Amino acid sequence: MDRNSQKKHHLLPVFLILLCAVFFIPAHTSAAPRINLEKYKKGDDYLVLAYNTRYGKTTYVRSQPSSKSAKLAKLKHSDALVVDQSRITAGVRTSWIPVYLPSKNVTGYVSTSIMRLKAISYASFRKGASPYAYDAICYGLKYLGTPYQSGGNDLKKGICCSALVTKCFRKAGRSMPETYVINQYNECKFISRRDLKPGDLIFYRSNTLPPYGGLVHVAIYIGNGFILNATGHTGSTYPNGGVCIKALSYGSHLASRAIYGRLL
C-alpha cells in the first residue's frame, strides 16, 4: 500500500464519524428549561393553567417528575391542564409542572419543554359578559374530566358541547333554549375577538361538516385566551376531549372559522 493509500485509509473512519454527526444527530437538542414556579402559586383565587403551545407536537403527563416514569395522558396542541399549586415548592427551579388529572383523580407532571403557564383570576369572571358568567363558568369547571358523548346530556356520564353550555347557564339562572348549537347561536349578538369577555360564547364552523349552517361546536370563553368546552374533535376523554379547557387557538381548522357571540 503506497503512502497516499495509507493516508486515505486513515481518513476514512474520521469521515464516517463526521457523516454520522451530520445526518443522525438532531439539529436542535436542548434540555427542558428549568423555571421557578413560585409566582404561579397564587392560591384558591386563581386558576393556573399549563398548556401545549406547539402545533403538531405532543407531550405526556407523567406519574413522576421524570421522563422514565409512566405515561398518564397525552397532551396535544392547545390542551390545557389545571396546575396543582399544592405541589409547587417555593424557591426551587424545575423542568416539571405538577398538573391535576380529574378523570384519574391524580396529580401528574408535564415537562416544560413545550408548555407555557397562564393564570386566570376567578374575580375576572365577575367582570364578564353578563351577570351569569361567574356562576356559569365555576359550575362548568366542577365537571372537568367528564367524557364527551355526541348528543349526551349527563354531566357525569357523558355530555355534548351545546348541552354543557345550556346546563352551565341554566344553573347560573339564565333561561336557555333547547340544547342545539343553532338555538344558542340565535340567542347571541355578535362581537369581535378583541371584545371577548368571560362568559361569551364561541361558535366554530366547518366547511366539511355542514349541520346547522356549518356550526359544529360551541364553547364558553373563560378569559386570558382559554375556553371551557365539551369536545370530541381530538378525542372523547380528558384532557384531549370531554369537558376540558383549551387555548382559544384550539383546532386551527376550526379556530380560523370561529364566530364570537354574547348572550342577549
Identify the role of each PLM range.
Residues 146-198, 209, 238:
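Catalytic cysteine-centered active-site loop
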Residues 1-33:
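Gram-positive cell-envelope targeting signals
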Residues 29-51, 58:
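Low-complexity, acidic Ser/Thr/Pro-rich repeat tracts that form intrinsically disordered stalk/linker regions
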Residues 74-113:
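SH3/SH3-like beta-barrel superfamily modules
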Residues 176-180, 220-247:
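Catalytic Cys-His active-site segments of thiol-dependent hydrolases/isopeptidases
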Residues 32-42, 100-134:
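Boundary regions of SH3-family modules and the immediately adjacent low-complexity/disordered segments
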Residues 63-77:
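SH3/SH3-like (including bacterial SH3b) beta-barrel domains
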Residues 79, 199-200:
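Structural motif
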